Amino acid sequence: MGRSAPMLESEVEALRVVAKEKLPRMLAAAAERTGLHYRRVTVRKTHSRWGSCTREGNISLSLYLATLPDELIDYVCVHELCHTVHPNHSADFHAFVNHHLGGKEKTLAAKLRTYHPGRKRKEG
């Protein structure tokens, strides 16, 4: 598989419009399904991570998350929501995430590692 190319700024701006509508909606659906709560959500142009959660329950999602398959967007949303209960990456945290993902955390995490924020994925 070849290296992925960075997105053009025009592509990023078009993606921002989609992401600001889609990602908060998917986070809200994941929160409803899991019974977990967050304070607010922001969508940012971050290259180093797909999402983050503060101790206050504020969740930030990378706009590049909107380029992923819905099952991976849901995985990141559930992962960040679980940080509202476990603000770390302990064994308890991962067990909690895995519970809310029907035992698929490791599979989804492995799939997510094949993508990189802000890069176009080369098929192949």
Residue ranges and their predicted role:
Residues 1-75, 84-124:
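Active-site-proximal or metal-binding-adjacent scaffold patches in catalytic folds
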Residues 80:
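Walker B catalytic acidic pair
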